[in-house]
């Protein structure tokens, strides 16, 4: 046999983790000869599609071939190597926007000149939140090892979105417009910024 599938019970005798099934569970064991990565994808993706289509209780399942994301792109856009693509929030690299002459945020420019990058994370429908909401996020970021978070609140003024908040005054109108376009921002959104060396 050059290949076979085997569905069998598995007894896990090791420490449990959040992404592991504890104790007994069923697994699909695959043995294949003389294959490469693409052969594995072509064999497995239809099985997963049929499995979740038949037993997914009516939930929508992506059709093969499944979307593939490079590790570096996944870490940049989602902050994890196993993202939940149902979550619409993405992380954006806005380093080049911070280099603009009409952005006067000198602390970021200084860090960028030393090799740092700037990432931005939108927070939909949060611009009307109280100051304590933003302070809590900032404190959390510091607890996680970041130097802090800058943020801009987007509000509509005469049919145009404008940037408010602690660092909004350092951005010219054209720079705000580019942020809105690049980061897919809308009215009442907040955009958080973090600047540090890439890790």
Go through the PLM ranges and name each one:
Residues 1-199:
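Class II aminoacyl-tRNA synthetase catalytic cores and aaRS-like
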């Amino acid at each position: 046999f050059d290949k076979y599938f085997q569905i069998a019970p598995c007894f896990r005798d090791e420490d449990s983790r959040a992404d592991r099934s504890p104790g007994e569970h069923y697994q699909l064991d695959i043995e294949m000869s003389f294959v490469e990565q693409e052969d594995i994808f072509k064999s497995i993706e239809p099985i997963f599609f049929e499995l979740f289509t038949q037993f997914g209780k009516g939930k929508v399942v992506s059709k093969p071939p499944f979307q593939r994301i490079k590790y570096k792109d996944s870490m940049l856009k989602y902050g994890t190597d196993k993202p939940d693509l149902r979550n619409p929030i993405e992380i954006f690299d806005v380093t080049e926007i911070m280099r603009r002459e009409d952005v006067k945020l000198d602390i970021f420019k200084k860090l960028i000149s030393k090799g740092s990058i700037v990432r931005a994370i939108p927070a939909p429908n949060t611009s009307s939140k109280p100051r304590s909401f933003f302070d809590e996020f900032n404190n959390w970021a510091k607890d996680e090892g970041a130097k802090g978070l800058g943020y801009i609140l987007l509000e509509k003024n005469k049919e145009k979105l404008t940037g408010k908040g602690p660092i909004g005054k350092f951005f010219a109108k054209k720079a705000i417009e580019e942020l809105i376009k690049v980061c897919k921002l809308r009215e009442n959104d907040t955009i958080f910024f973090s600047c540090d060396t890439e890790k």
